């Protein structure tokens, strides 16, 4: 949960680097929250037919900016520009490439986007 909160606190931090653990823990908690909120939407009758419910929509809006920020920092950790995020516009293949990038280890030591986040206290 600490990793999730770290991302939320740095919700406009598009500079710097994000470790794999920071990124994937944020994604995992998002999946869990979205699932739970989806169940609540369904139980409360707040889910539109074939669409998102009220709670999941509000949650999605709230984490939209922090998700982009951590995605940019994750790309920076692999010494890639945030422009690589444009691959999200290419269905399936672009998404797969981004997943591969997000699974790769960050560059050891300092890179052009900042110091190694593993070495920071």
Curated annotation (Swiss-Prot):
Alphabetized Pfam families for the sequence: DUF805
Membrane topology note: Multi-pass membrane protein
Segments on the Periplasmic side according to the record's topology features: 1-23, 71-80
First-listed, main subcellular location of the protein, grouped into a coarse class: membrane
Transmembrane stretches, start-end: 24-44, 50-70, 81-101
Disulfide bonds: none
Keywords, alphabetical: Cell inner membrane, Cell membrane, Membrane, Transmembrane, Transmembrane helix
Subcellular location: Cell inner membrane
Stretches in topological domain Cytoplasmic: 45-49, 102-121
Gene Ontology cellular-component terms listed: plasma membrane
Protein family: To E.coli YhaI.
This protein's name: Inner membrane protein YhaH
Species name: Escherichia coli O157:H7
Gene: yhaH
